[in-house]
Regions:
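Secretory targeting signals
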Residues: 1-10, 25, 45-68, 130-181, ...
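Hydrophobic/aromatic residues in alpha-helical transmembrane segments
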Residues: 79-84, 175-179, 188, 226, ...
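Aromatic- and glycine-rich beta-strand/loop motifs that create alpha-glucan
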Residues: 92-130
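Pore- or pathway-lining transmembrane helices of multi-pass membrane proteins that form conduits
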Residues: 8-28, 129-132, 269-287
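Terminal transmembrane helical anchor/hairpin motif
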Residues: 19-99, 142-158, 280-349
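Transmembrane alpha-helices and adjacent helix-loop boundaries
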Residues: 10-11, 186, 257-261, 285-290
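Helix-loop-helix units of permease transmembrane domains in multi-pass membrane transporters
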Residues: 180-214
Length: 349
């Protein structure tokens, strides 16, 4: 609530929340100190996880919650409530405390850019796509260095530590945030009436899909760059596994399928948060399907399978992955275009 009060952009508040959740999840594994409210949340779980380095087996068990953890969570609750109350009482009506829309863009620059990119120029979209992979890589690298008794000093094990939670839980919801942001303006007021009279449904959906795919692909390039740079800094022996590049291509294809699906969902639903929640649910279902061997069933599962976060040198059936991703791209875009063509413009108000 305090983040939503501080930032007028839902995107900024959600991005910080995702980053905090990722940090808290990693801190729960590598440290017993609770530095953030998100790590406090994980510490209150009645389920404990133990890892035996000798046998490399992980076990789950019920545990009692320490009084100190409960006390610290109450301190966070009271502290953030009082901070939010103070900020709310001092804020002027109708103004955001931190405006993220102060940059003026010239008309000549606007004319050379796609309307979808112009929208994103006024949003801090770079924050989660830069910081969350960086946080994941930094914490994963620390975990990699500190657990050499369990992990091997190889490129393969470094990749599993840097990309494990990113590929399984966080990348798809990030794409969901981006797609919801791209469709937010269309769902405001009577903008549908204007937009659908000046552009075709096919071009509208195609432009949004292309924009989301391009930016998400740049995020994958950033993830790859961090991985390669950190491996060189650590002085890992040997070369990067040759299959790594095929993994990145598979991830980009999966991202294209996810952006097509998420863009269509964001077009259907007026709610900003619902498609994001569906993306997170899709990641959980995708993880289950991947474990059961049905990685081709959903684009969320092809992303987990294609990235190879659990084993970069594992099996990769690229033709099946390509067929699955192509199906979801054409199906999602086709359904979206057909929906826009058959719907009355007034129904979108």
């Amino acid at each position: 609530c305090t983040l939503s009060l501080l930032f007028s952009s839902q995107f900024a508040a959600l991005s910080i929340a995702f980053g905090g959740t990722l940090s808290g999840l990693f801190l729960a594994f590598i440290s017993t100190d609770m530095w953030t409210p998100w790590s406090v949340f994980f510490s209150l779980s009645p389920i404990g996880m133990d890892y035996d380095k000798a046998s490399r087996l992980m076990s789950l068990s019920l545990r009692s919650i320490p009084i100190s953890d409960i006390f610290l969570s109450l301190l966070y609750l009271i502290g953030t409530f009082l901070l939010g109350l103070l900020l709310f009482t001092r804020a002027e009506q109708g103004e955001a405390l931190f405006s993220l829309h102060r940059q003026n863009v010239s008309h000549s620059l606007h004319s050379s850019l796609s309307p979808e990119f112009i929208k994103l120029k006024r949003n801090p979209i770079w924050i989660p796509f830069l910081l969350i992979p960086l946080i994941s890589a930094l914490i994963g690298t620390v975990n990699f260095v500190q657990n050499q008794g369990v992990l091997q000093y190889t490129w393969e094990d470094l990749w599993t530590q840097q990309s494990l939670f990113l590929g399984m839980f966080f990348l798809a919801p990030l794409i969901g945030i981006l797609c919801s942001l791209l469709w937010r303006m269309e769902h405001q007021g009577s903008n549908w009436n204007l937009i659908l009279t000046i552009t075709s449904p096919g071009k509208l959906l195609r432009d949004k899909w292309f924009t989301a795919t391009l930016l998400s692909t740049l995020c994958m390039v950033w993830i790859s760059f961090i991985y390669l740079l950190s491996g060189k800094i650590l002085g890992l022996p040997g070369a990067v596994p040759a299959i790594f590049w095929m993994r990145m291509l598979s991830a980009i294809l999966s991202i294209a399928a996810i952006t097509a699906l998420q863009s269509t969902l964001s077009m259907f639903f007026h709610s900003f948060a619902l498609p994001i929640a569906l993306a997170f649910l899709g990641s959980l279902v995708g993880l289950t399907l991947t474990v059961k061997g049905a990685y081709y069933a959903l684009p969320y599962s092809t992303l987990i399978y294609g990235m190879g976060s659990t084993s970069i040198t594992g099996e990769l059936n690229f033709p099946i992955l390509l067929l699955s991703c192509s199906f979801y791209i054409f199906a999602a875009l086709g359904i979206g275009i057909l929906y826009l063509k058959k719907s009355d413009v007034r129904t979108h108000v």
